[in-house]
């Protein structure tokens, strides 16, 4: 082990080497040939992507619902086929019982109509009924997966409504719970446990108070065994809540809710499109985006779906015109129901895995995925939504070459200064951010596949009735669409010299990142020595060894993956990632206490994308290292090095113990 002074010297030497390598690469040409990038950028139409989005938002696209199947069959599939693409629909069961990974599939939901009215107010004489919600006017005002029914009852404010404490001394039996919590949790407490007949959900006072007229997206998500006991719910705006509270101060307020909907077995509908590879068609570059979300919901994620449709058309058109040669590998587009559809897909295609030796593919090898680009909220007008575009870097548990490629193509896109004829001239300042969770790239990362998410954050319209087509921008569609399409094209067409160039650039990026971590480690050692800092340094030295062989192997994890028998045994993951919250149901009280303490210790510091790792993310990454060949000592070191946190072996052992009891890992 090096002394502190030696560590500082090593750090400076390493950092100097990183800067030298980076300066050499900075003067080189971009990874995507400029003529190829220009062909893609010139063909890709931001207006066409926006028009695709405009068509998609006409449908109430809820997972497992007939309208989700309808938008796939009536919009996405025919447009792909009209562009000359090979395309098909695939469906999986979704009934509130079938599990994919740790997620229970949603029930099918056929929604037809719904209304909520103020029926009477004791403090007002001769009150005329006041409409609070009509599905035809604001589709998001009906809680998704609401059970059909007709009820009237007195409103009772139960605060958040998600905890038994909210109902102490409060009688909601036969009444309607007025709450600010998540509808699924409110229904389970208020309706199933305490006898309420329905729920009305209002926004918390801290939730975007500058926009009191918005209605938030919310859902009930009943399981099959809850079908007889569940009920329906509505969302109202903050302004409507304030009006109701004013009336309730004068006396009892009764509301009347009526919903025409059916809950039962459904189907998760996926759309596939392919541009087949000519040399290794079994190796896929995967582009994904979720097609679901309520009617109107434009940026989330009709925008990603519309942008993907235009990306597929763009490449097919350029190939047909012989402006681009067909790709060597298959480019596979999948429009999915978020999480549930992706988990169903990988559960039913167990052959899917990372391609491994990606730069020297063997002919006629097994089907595999080289990389995944996930498009989720990509069309924002950044001024109207007060947001910025980003892509997520991959975590340390998967090969890191995708970070370098995406960074380089992003810079190339910035230099192109792209706009659409009917779009804005908004200043574009995109960025690369650390891995953040919350979309379908999580599932592929759990398979070991390098995966990135393209999106926007923050966005004040997210999951609200204000996420409409007028908040999209054809210029943003063109920029992000060209960026994603060019990156995918490189992955599907790169020859050995191009891969060598990417590996060299990735090597320099990795050296620079590890030097940054070592600089932080040296600061910790100087100011406040800790066990985590020592692990960080040890892991840095170990990863430095990996880097010496990376120029030959292509990624820092290859040595372990290719020769697992050389390494110690360790915990082995037994389930798909990410974990649903239900995965920890039934844990002993002592373990639940520890989990709660860790959630508080690693709490998110943002309502949007977290700027520091939270407990769910750290758990995800820890489990992704659990390959049966990585010891808990190594996992603690890897996590400490990645997040610059003091995570010791005892912490990992405790996590493994809990996961083992839940049959999520094997010790």
List the predicted regions and their residue ranges.
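Extracellular/luminal Protease-associated
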Residues: 64-67, 71-74, 130-232, 296, ...
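His/Asp/Glu-rich mid-to-C-terminal helical/loop segments that flank catalytic regions of hydrolases
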Residues: 329, 460-512, 627-630, 649-667
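Soluble metallo-hydrolase cores and metallopeptidase-like ectodomains found primarily
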Residues: 134-165, 220-299, 310-313, 317-326
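Second-shell loop/turn segments in exported
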Residues: 36-44, 57-68, 103-105, 142-146, ...
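Short helix-loop-beta-strand segments that form the rim/entrance of peptidase-like active sites
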Residues: 314-345, 375
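Noncatalytic luminal/extracellular "stalk/propeptide" segments of secretory-pathway proteins
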Residues: 30-32, 46, 54-173
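Metal-dependent peptidase/peptidase-like ectodomains
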Residues: 44, 133, 233-234, 241-242, ...
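N-terminal capping segment at the start of a domain
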Residues: 31-67, 377, 630, 634-642
């Amino acid at each position: 082990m090096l002394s502190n002074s030696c560590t500082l010297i090593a750090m400076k030497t390493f950092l100097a080497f990183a800067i030298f390598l980076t300066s050499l690469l900075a003067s080189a040409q971009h990874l995507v040939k400029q003529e190829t990038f220009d062909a893609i950028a010139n063909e890709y139409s931001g207006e066409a992507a926006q028009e695709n989005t405009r068509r998609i938002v006409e449908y109430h696209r809820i997972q497992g619902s007939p309208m989700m199947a309808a938008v796939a069959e009536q919009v996405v599939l025919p447009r792909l086929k009209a562009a000359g693409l090979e395309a098909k629909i695939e469906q999986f069961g979704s009934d509130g019982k079938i599990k994919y990974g740790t997620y229970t599939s949603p029930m099918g939901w056929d929604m037809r109509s719904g209304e909520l009215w103020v029926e009477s107010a004791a403090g007002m004489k001769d009150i005329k009924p006041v409409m609070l919600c009509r599905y035809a006017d604001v589709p998001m005002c009906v809680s998704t997966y609401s059970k059909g029914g007709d009820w009237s009852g007195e409103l009772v404010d139960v605060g958040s409504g998600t905890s038994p404490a909210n109902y102490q001394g409060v009688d909601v039996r036969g009444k309607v719970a007025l709450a600010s919590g998540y509808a699924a949790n409110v229904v389970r407490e208020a309706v199933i446990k305490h006898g309420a007949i329905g729920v009305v959900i209002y926004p918390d006072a801290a939730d975007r108070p500058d926009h009191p007229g918005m209605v938030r997206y919310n859902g009930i998500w009943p399981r099959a065994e809850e079908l007889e006991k569940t009920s329906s719910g509505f969302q109202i705006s903050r302004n409507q809540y304030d009006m109701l509270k004013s009336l309730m101060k004068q006396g009892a307020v009764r509301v009347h809710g009526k919903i025409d909907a059916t809950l039962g077995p459904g189907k998760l509908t996926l759309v596939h499109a392919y541009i087949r590879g000519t040399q290794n068609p079994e190796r896929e570059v995967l582009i994904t985006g979720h097609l679901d979300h309520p009617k109107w919901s434009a940026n989330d994620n009709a925008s990603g779906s519309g942008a993907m449709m235009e990306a597929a058309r763009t490449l097919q058109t350029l190939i047909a015109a012989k402006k681009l040669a067909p790709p060597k590998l298959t480019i596979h587009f999948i429009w999915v129901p978020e999480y549930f559809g992706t988990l169903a897909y990988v559960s039913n295609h167990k052959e899917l895995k990372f391609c491994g030796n990606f730069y020297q593919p063997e002919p006629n090898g097994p089907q595999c995925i080289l990389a995944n680009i996930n498009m989720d909220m990509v069309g924002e007008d950044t001024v109207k939504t007060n947001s910025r575009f980003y892509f997520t870097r991959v975590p340390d548990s998967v090969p890191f070459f995708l970070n370098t490629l995406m960074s380089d193509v992003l810079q190339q896109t910035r230099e192109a200064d792209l706009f659409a004829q009917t779009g804005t001239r908004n200043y574009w300042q995109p960025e690369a951010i650390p891995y953040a969770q919350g979309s379908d790239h999580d599932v592929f990362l759990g398979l070991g596949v390098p995966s990135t998410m393209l999106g926007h954050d923050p966005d004040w319209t997210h999951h609200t009735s204000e996420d409409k087509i007028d908040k999209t921008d054809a210029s943003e569609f063109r920029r992000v669409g060209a960026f994603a399409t060019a990156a995918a094209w490189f992955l599907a067409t790169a020859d050995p010299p191009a891969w060598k160039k990417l590996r060299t650039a990735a090597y320099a990026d990795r050296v620079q990142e590890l030097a940054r971590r070592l600089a932080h480690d040296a600061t910790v050692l100087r100011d406040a020595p800790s066990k985590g800092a020592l692990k960080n340094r040890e892991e840095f030295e170990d990863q430095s060894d990996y880097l010496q062989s990376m120029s030959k192997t292509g990624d820092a994890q290859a040595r372990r993956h290719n020769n697992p028998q050389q390494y110690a045994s360790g915990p082995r993951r037994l389930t798909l990632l990410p974990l649903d919250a239900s995965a920890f149901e039934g844990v002993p009280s002592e373990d639940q206490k520890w989990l709660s303490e860790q959630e508080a210790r690693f709490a998110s510091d943002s309502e949007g994308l977290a700027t520091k790792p939270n407990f769910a993310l750290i758990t995800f990454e820890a489990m992704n290292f659990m390959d049966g060949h990585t010891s808990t000592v190594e996992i603690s070191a890897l996590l400490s090095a990645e997040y610059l946190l003091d995570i010791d072996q005892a912490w990992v052992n405790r996590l493994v113990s809990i996961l083992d009891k839940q049959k999520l890992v094997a010790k």
